[in-house]
Amino acid sequence: MDIHTFIANYQEAFGQHAELPIAFWYSDRMEASTEKVTGCLFKCMKQVRDGKTVSLSNETITCGGGKFYTGFTEMPERVPGFVSLKEKYKKTPEMVVDFVNELQIPKADKAYLHFARIDKIPSFDEVEGVLFLPTPDILSGLVTWTFFDNNALDAVAAPFGSGCCSVITQTIIENRKQGKRTFLGFFDPSVRPYFEADLLSFTIPMSRFKEMYHTMRESCLFDTHAWGKIKERIQLSQSGDVHILSSPISFPILPDIYLQEIRIEDAAAIYHAIDTHRDYLRTWLPFVDNMRTTADEEAFLRQVLSLSLI
């Protein structure tokens, strides 16, 4: 597997400005001097997203849960009560204990856990997993790509867990048993403040990534009309050049017929109503054949109205 080839394919599929995924792996060699991370270990992820490599260890992770889920320590005694009685993520402390016992978290046999953007590593050789931080549109592409060659009901899984458990622990376990599951995460309210509101995590263990690397260009992410429409929207959002007015607008809906002072949501609904008269209006609105839902028409209007407002 060649990193540069994957990056080229990824950017072709999701846009040149799509945020690159993050690789993580263990080793006994410190890749980068890293200060202690107070609280949630994902506080350091901004540095990684900006291109810096981070090397975490038992000394630099201060969160007891973070140390435990990365395999550097045993579970602190207070964790079951904290997760249940304080955070209220499980009904009882016993449920937390049962969850942890079932999970069988592997102990770290190396001194450091590293995170780096994939364009900052030389190869995938030591990597345990690849972490994506996708928006909903990009996530839809990643999930669809995952399902391309895997019919398993748990091909994409969203198990309970903290941010570090859903991203790191689950991925490590899956990779070391050569599994095929991928993982949705960042449903944990405690980790969400450290990331944008429209992002989730999607993690692919290297055991599965080795297969998916070869299927990307075969999947719907290339040369399909459906993904092409989503890719256009992704690229439009990445450009940062679009400014949509929230105030009422006026524009022609048919020759000599104007919609006056309406909100864009109402305009989309009106366009959707036209759906019942496609044959009659095809001459006037040739694009309606490509519109299937209110969301389609609203997306179209946003694109058009961002270019020329009347």
Language-model features: locations:
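Acidic, serine/proline-rich low-complexity intrinsically disordered regions
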Residues: D2-S246
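GNAT-family acyltransferases
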Residues: L245-I310
